[in-house]
Amino acid sequence: MTTKEAIADMALEAQEEDDAGPPDGGFRAWLVVLGGFLAYFVTFGMLNSFGTFQEYYGEKLLPGRSTSEISWIGSLQLFLLFIGGLFFGPVFDAKGSKVLFIPGTLLLSLSQMMVSLCKEYYQFILAQSLLFGIAVAMLFYPTISAISHWFHHRRGLAMGIVLTGSSLGGIAWPLILERLFAVVGFPWGLRIVGFISFALLAPACFMVIPRLPPRKSGGLSKADLSEGLKDRRYWLTVVGMLFVIWGMFIPFYYIPLFAMDHGVNSSFANSLISILNAGSFVGRIVSGALADKLGR
Protein backbone atom coordinates (compact mmCIF):
# COMPACT_ATOMS: atom_id res chain seq x y z
CA MET A 1 0.00 0.00 0.00
CA THR A 2 1.40 3.39 -1.00
CA THR A 3 1.65 6.39 1.30
CA LYS A 4 -1.13 8.07 -0.65
CA GLU A 5 -3.42 5.09 -0.16
CA ALA A 6 -2.57 4.93 3.55
CA ILE A 7 -3.47 8.60 3.99
CA ALA A 8 -6.73 8.04 2.09
CA ASP A 9 -7.62 5.12 4.34
CA MET A 10 -6.81 7.12 7.47
CA ALA A 11 -9.14 9.86 6.25
CA LEU A 12 -11.81 7.26 5.54
CA GLU A 13 -11.45 5.75 9.02
CA ALA A 14 -11.86 9.21 10.54
CA GLN A 15 -14.97 9.71 8.42
CA GLU A 16 -16.38 6.37 9.58
CA GLU A 17 -15.77 7.28 13.22
CA ASP A 18 -17.81 10.45 12.73
CA ASP A 19 -20.50 8.55 10.83
CA ALA A 20 -23.79 8.10 12.67
CA GLY A 21 -24.04 4.54 11.41
CA PRO A 22 -26.48 2.74 9.12
CA PRO A 23 -29.83 4.56 8.88
CA ASP A 24 -31.84 1.31 9.12
CA GLY A 25 -34.38 2.68 6.68
CA GLY A 26 -35.19 5.50 4.33
CA PHE A 27 -35.77 5.58 0.58
CA ARG A 28 -32.16 4.94 -0.41
CA ALA A 29 -31.77 2.02 1.98
CA TRP A 30 -34.95 0.28 0.83
CA LEU A 31 -33.95 0.87 -2.78
CA VAL A 32 -30.85 -1.22 -2.07
CA VAL A 33 -33.14 -3.93 -0.68
CA LEU A 34 -35.26 -3.82 -3.85
CA GLY A 35 -32.15 -4.10 -6.03
CA GLY A 36 -30.94 -7.03 -3.96
CA PHE A 37 -34.36 -8.67 -4.27
CA LEU A 38 -34.15 -8.43 -8.08
CA ALA A 39 -30.60 -9.78 -8.09
CA TYR A 40 -31.51 -12.76 -5.93
CA PHE A 41 -34.65 -13.46 -7.96
CA VAL A 42 -32.45 -14.00 -11.00
CA THR A 43 -29.35 -15.55 -9.44
CA PHE A 44 -30.41 -17.76 -6.55
CA GLY A 45 -33.81 -18.22 -8.11
CA MET A 46 -32.11 -19.87 -11.07
CA LEU A 47 -29.71 -21.85 -8.88
CA ASN A 48 -32.68 -23.14 -6.89
CA SER A 49 -34.28 -24.26 -10.17
CA PHE A 50 -31.43 -26.45 -11.39
CA GLY A 51 -33.56 -29.55 -10.94
CA THR A 52 -35.49 -28.46 -14.04
CA PHE A 53 -32.26 -28.51 -16.05
CA GLN A 54 -31.16 -31.77 -14.41
CA GLU A 55 -34.32 -33.54 -15.55
CA TYR A 56 -34.41 -31.95 -19.02
CA TYR A 57 -30.75 -32.65 -19.78
CA GLY A 58 -31.07 -36.27 -18.74
CA GLU A 59 -34.16 -36.77 -20.91
CA LYS A 60 -33.42 -34.59 -23.95
CA LEU A 61 -30.00 -33.00 -24.36
CA LEU A 62 -27.51 -35.27 -22.57
CA PRO A 63 -29.20 -38.68 -22.46
CA GLY A 64 -25.86 -40.48 -22.58
CA ARG A 65 -24.63 -38.81 -19.41
CA SER A 66 -25.27 -40.11 -15.91
CA THR A 67 -27.21 -38.18 -13.29
CA SER A 68 -23.96 -37.60 -11.42
CA GLU A 69 -22.23 -36.14 -14.47
CA ILE A 70 -25.12 -33.77 -15.18
CA SER A 71 -25.27 -32.63 -11.55
CA TRP A 72 -21.65 -31.49 -11.85
CA ILE A 73 -22.91 -28.65 -14.05
CA GLY A 74 -24.89 -27.24 -11.14
CA SER A 75 -22.35 -28.22 -8.49
CA LEU A 76 -19.60 -26.23 -10.20
CA GLN A 77 -21.91 -23.22 -10.28
CA LEU A 78 -22.16 -23.37 -6.50
CA PHE A 79 -18.43 -23.91 -6.06
CA LEU A 80 -17.60 -20.82 -8.10
CA LEU A 81 -20.26 -18.81 -6.29
CA PHE A 82 -18.84 -19.50 -2.84
CA ILE A 83 -15.13 -19.48 -3.72
CA GLY A 84 -15.71 -16.22 -5.56
CA GLY A 85 -15.96 -14.34 -2.28
CA LEU A 86 -12.18 -14.58 -1.88
CA PHE A 87 -11.77 -12.48 -5.02
CA PHE A 88 -14.87 -10.33 -5.34
CA GLY A 89 -15.16 -9.34 -1.67
CA PRO A 90 -11.89 -7.34 -1.75
CA VAL A 91 -12.87 -5.84 -5.11
CA PHE A 92 -16.08 -4.52 -3.56
CA ASP A 93 -14.12 -3.06 -0.65
CA ALA A 94 -11.69 -1.31 -2.99
CA LYS A 95 -13.91 -0.30 -5.91
CA GLY A 96 -17.55 -0.40 -4.83
CA SER A 97 -20.47 -2.30 -6.33
CA LYS A 98 -20.86 -1.10 -9.91
CA VAL A 99 -17.49 -2.46 -11.01
CA LEU A 100 -18.87 -5.93 -10.18
CA PHE A 101 -22.59 -5.53 -10.76
CA ILE A 102 -22.49 -4.20 -14.32
CA PRO A 103 -20.08 -6.81 -15.77
CA GLY A 104 -21.79 -9.48 -13.64
CA THR A 105 -25.13 -8.61 -15.23
CA LEU A 106 -23.67 -8.75 -18.73
CA LEU A 107 -21.83 -12.01 -18.02
CA LEU A 108 -24.93 -13.68 -16.58
CA SER A 109 -27.07 -12.78 -19.59
CA LEU A 110 -24.26 -13.86 -21.92
CA SER A 111 -23.97 -17.21 -20.14
CA GLN A 112 -27.67 -17.93 -20.69
CA MET A 113 -27.35 -17.01 -24.36
CA MET A 114 -24.35 -19.33 -24.65
CA VAL A 115 -26.20 -22.19 -22.92
CA SER A 116 -28.87 -21.89 -25.61
CA LEU A 117 -26.21 -22.90 -28.16
CA CYS A 118 -24.76 -25.81 -26.18
CA LYS A 119 -24.92 -29.36 -27.48
CA GLU A 120 -21.94 -31.10 -25.85
CA TYR A 121 -21.31 -31.75 -22.16
CA TYR A 122 -18.13 -29.66 -21.98
CA GLN A 123 -20.00 -26.72 -23.51
CA PHE A 124 -22.54 -26.79 -20.68
CA ILE A 125 -19.66 -26.87 -18.19
CA LEU A 126 -18.09 -23.78 -19.75
CA ALA A 127 -21.28 -21.76 -20.29
CA GLN A 128 -23.58 -22.81 -17.45
CA SER A 129 -21.06 -23.78 -14.78
CA LEU A 130 -18.14 -21.43 -15.36
CA LEU A 131 -19.73 -18.27 -16.78
CA PHE A 132 -22.95 -18.41 -14.78
CA GLY A 133 -21.21 -19.33 -11.52
CA ILE A 134 -18.76 -16.43 -11.78
CA ALA A 135 -21.54 -14.03 -12.75
CA VAL A 136 -23.65 -15.01 -9.74
CA ALA A 137 -20.66 -14.47 -7.44
CA MET A 138 -20.13 -10.99 -8.91
CA LEU A 139 -23.72 -10.10 -8.00
CA PHE A 140 -24.02 -11.95 -4.69
CA TYR A 141 -21.20 -10.38 -2.67
CA PRO A 142 -21.89 -6.70 -3.48
CA THR A 143 -25.52 -7.25 -2.46
CA ILE A 144 -24.92 -8.71 1.00
CA SER A 145 -22.14 -6.18 1.63
CA ALA A 146 -24.25 -3.19 0.62
CA ILE A 147 -27.11 -4.32 2.86
CA SER A 148 -24.77 -4.21 5.87
CA HIS A 149 -23.87 -0.62 4.96
CA TRP A 150 -27.49 0.52 5.18
CA PHE A 151 -28.93 -1.64 7.97
CA HIS A 152 -27.81 -2.65 11.44
CA HIS A 153 -30.69 -3.12 13.89
CA ARG A 154 -33.02 -4.19 11.04
CA ARG A 155 -30.41 -6.03 9.00
CA GLY A 156 -32.04 -9.43 9.48
CA LEU A 157 -35.36 -8.15 8.18
CA ALA A 158 -33.71 -6.39 5.23
CA MET A 159 -31.71 -9.47 4.30
CA GLY A 160 -34.79 -11.66 4.74
CA ILE A 161 -36.69 -9.52 2.23
CA VAL A 162 -33.78 -9.75 -0.20
CA LEU A 163 -33.71 -13.52 0.21
CA THR A 164 -37.38 -13.81 -0.63
CA GLY A 165 -36.24 -12.93 -4.15
CA SER A 166 -34.55 -16.33 -4.34
CA SER A 167 -37.76 -18.00 -3.13
CA LEU A 168 -39.96 -16.22 -5.68
CA GLY A 169 -37.39 -16.88 -8.38
CA GLY A 170 -37.35 -20.53 -7.38
CA ILE A 171 -41.13 -20.59 -7.69
CA ALA A 172 -41.26 -18.81 -11.05
CA TRP A 173 -38.27 -20.09 -13.01
CA PRO A 174 -39.13 -23.83 -13.05
CA LEU A 175 -42.61 -23.04 -14.37
CA ILE A 176 -41.29 -20.49 -16.88
CA LEU A 177 -38.54 -22.81 -18.11
CA GLU A 178 -40.85 -25.81 -18.48
CA ARG A 179 -43.36 -23.75 -20.47
CA LEU A 180 -40.73 -22.12 -22.69
CA PHE A 181 -39.05 -25.45 -23.46
CA ALA A 182 -42.41 -26.90 -24.50
CA VAL A 183 -43.55 -23.92 -26.61
CA VAL A 184 -40.43 -22.45 -28.24
CA GLY A 185 -37.82 -25.12 -27.53
CA PHE A 186 -34.68 -25.09 -25.41
CA PRO A 187 -32.52 -22.65 -27.46
CA TRP A 188 -35.06 -19.85 -27.70
CA GLY A 189 -36.31 -20.59 -24.20
CA LEU A 190 -32.87 -19.82 -22.76
CA ARG A 191 -32.51 -16.73 -24.94
CA ILE A 192 -35.80 -15.38 -23.64
CA VAL A 193 -34.65 -16.11 -20.09
CA GLY A 194 -31.43 -14.22 -20.84
CA PHE A 195 -33.40 -11.15 -21.94
CA ILE A 196 -35.63 -11.35 -18.85
CA SER A 197 -32.59 -11.67 -16.59
CA PHE A 198 -30.96 -8.61 -18.15
CA ALA A 199 -34.16 -6.57 -17.81
CA LEU A 200 -34.35 -7.40 -14.08
CA LEU A 201 -30.67 -6.95 -13.31
CA ALA A 202 -30.04 -3.74 -15.26
CA PRO A 203 -31.95 -1.50 -12.80
CA ALA A 204 -30.43 -3.39 -9.86
CA CYS A 205 -26.98 -2.21 -11.02
CA PHE A 206 -27.98 1.32 -9.98
CA MET A 207 -29.94 0.35 -6.87
CA VAL A 208 -27.36 -1.75 -5.01
CA ILE A 209 -24.98 1.02 -3.98
CA PRO A 210 -22.78 1.07 -0.85
CA ARG A 211 -23.28 3.86 1.66
CA LEU A 212 -19.60 4.18 2.55
CA PRO A 213 -16.86 5.12 0.07
CA PRO A 214 -14.46 2.37 -1.05
CA ARG A 215 -11.19 1.74 0.72
CA LYS A 216 -8.25 2.37 -1.58
CA SER A 217 -6.21 -0.39 0.05
CA GLY A 218 -8.89 -2.99 -0.68
CA GLY A 219 -10.51 -3.74 2.67
CA LEU A 220 -9.16 -5.42 5.79
CA SER A 221 -5.57 -5.00 6.85
CA LYS A 222 -3.49 -8.04 7.76
CA ALA A 223 -3.85 -7.12 11.43
CA ASP A 224 -7.66 -6.95 11.18
CA LEU A 225 -7.75 -10.25 9.29
CA SER A 226 -5.50 -11.95 11.82
CA GLU A 227 -7.65 -10.72 14.70
CA GLY A 228 -10.81 -11.96 13.01
CA LEU A 229 -9.34 -15.41 12.38
CA LYS A 230 -8.60 -15.75 16.09
CA ASP A 231 -12.23 -15.15 17.04
CA ARG A 232 -13.90 -18.40 18.12
CA ARG A 233 -17.32 -17.07 17.10
CA TYR A 234 -16.10 -16.71 13.53
CA TRP A 235 -15.02 -20.35 13.33
CA LEU A 236 -18.26 -21.55 14.93
CA THR A 237 -20.12 -19.64 12.23
CA VAL A 238 -17.92 -21.14 9.50
CA VAL A 239 -18.49 -24.69 10.76
CA GLY A 240 -22.21 -24.08 11.14
CA MET A 241 -22.52 -22.71 7.62
CA LEU A 242 -20.52 -25.66 6.29
CA PHE A 243 -23.16 -28.08 7.57
CA VAL A 244 -26.03 -25.85 6.42
CA ILE A 245 -24.75 -25.52 2.86
CA TRP A 246 -23.60 -29.15 2.65
CA GLY A 247 -27.05 -30.56 2.01
CA MET A 248 -29.15 -27.48 1.32
CA PHE A 249 -29.18 -27.71 -2.48
CA ILE A 250 -29.69 -31.48 -2.81
CA PRO A 251 -33.52 -31.28 -2.92
CA PHE A 252 -33.43 -28.48 -5.50
CA TYR A 253 -31.32 -30.67 -7.80
CA TYR A 254 -32.87 -34.09 -7.37
CA ILE A 255 -36.49 -33.81 -6.25
CA PRO A 256 -37.92 -34.03 -9.82
CA LEU A 257 -35.92 -37.18 -10.58
CA PHE A 258 -36.84 -38.70 -7.21
CA ALA A 259 -40.52 -38.01 -7.82
CA MET A 260 -40.44 -39.45 -11.35
CA ASP A 261 -38.76 -42.61 -10.05
CA HIS A 262 -41.80 -43.00 -7.79
CA GLY A 263 -44.36 -42.67 -10.57
CA VAL A 264 -45.01 -38.90 -10.61
CA ASN A 265 -45.43 -37.41 -14.10
CA SER A 266 -42.67 -35.08 -15.29
CA SER A 267 -44.78 -31.90 -15.27
CA PHE A 268 -45.83 -32.24 -11.63
CA ALA A 269 -42.36 -33.45 -10.67
CA ASN A 270 -40.96 -30.17 -12.01
CA SER A 271 -43.61 -28.23 -10.09
CA LEU A 272 -42.28 -29.74 -6.87
CA ILE A 273 -39.28 -27.40 -7.17
CA SER A 274 -41.66 -24.43 -7.12
CA ILE A 275 -43.54 -25.89 -4.15
CA LEU A 276 -40.26 -26.46 -2.33
CA ASN A 277 -39.20 -22.86 -2.88
CA ALA A 278 -42.63 -21.57 -1.85
CA GLY A 279 -42.17 -23.25 1.51
CA SER A 280 -39.14 -21.07 2.24
CA PHE A 281 -40.79 -17.74 1.38
CA VAL A 282 -42.34 -16.86 4.73
CA GLY A 283 -39.49 -18.38 6.71
CA ARG A 284 -36.92 -16.08 5.17
CA ILE A 285 -38.69 -12.91 6.32
CA VAL A 286 -39.80 -14.28 9.69
CA SER A 287 -36.38 -15.70 10.58
CA GLY A 288 -34.72 -12.42 9.62
CA ALA A 289 -37.10 -10.38 11.76
CA LEU A 290 -36.67 -12.79 14.68
CA ALA A 291 -32.90 -12.55 14.36
CA ASP A 292 -33.16 -8.78 14.82
CA LYS A 293 -35.27 -9.26 17.95
CA LEU A 294 -33.59 -12.27 19.55
CA GLY A 295 -30.01 -11.74 18.42
CA ARG A 296 -27.94 -12.89 15.50
UniProtKB/Swiss-Prot annotation:
Q: Where in the cell is it found?
A: Cell membrane
Identify the domain of life.
Eukaryota
Query: Gene3D superfamilies attached here?
Result: MFS general substrate transporter like domains (1.20.1250.20)
Summary of the knockout phenotype: Blocks the secretions of pyranterreones.
Here the disulfide bonds are none
Induction (free text): Expression is positively regulated by the cluster-specific transcription factor pytR.
Q: Which Pfam families would you find in this protein's record? A: MFS_1
The keyword Transport is annotated on this UniProt entry: yes
Membrane-crossing residue ranges in chain numbering = 30-50, 72-92, 98-118, 124-144, 157-177, 180-200, 238-258, 271-291
The record lists glycosylation at: N265
Q: Does the keyword section mention Ligase? A: no
- Enumerate the UniProt keywords alphabetically: Cell membrane, Glycoprotein, Membrane, Transmembrane, Transmembrane helix, Transport
GO cellular component terms, semicolon-separated: plasma membrane
> What topology in the membrane does the UniProt record assign?
Multi-pass membrane protein
Q: Per UniProt, what is one GO molecular function of this protein? A: transmembrane transporter activity
Biological function: MFS-type transporter; part of the gene cluster that mediates the biosynthesis of pyranterreones, a family of antioxidative compounds. Directly involved in the secretion of pyranterreones.
Q: Which family does it belong to?
A: Belongs to the major facilitator superfamily. Monocarboxylate porter (TC 2.A.1.13) family.
* Designated name of the protein: MFS-type transporter pytF
Highest lineage ranks of the organism? Answer: Eukaryota, Fungi, Dikarya, Ascomycota, Pezizomycotina
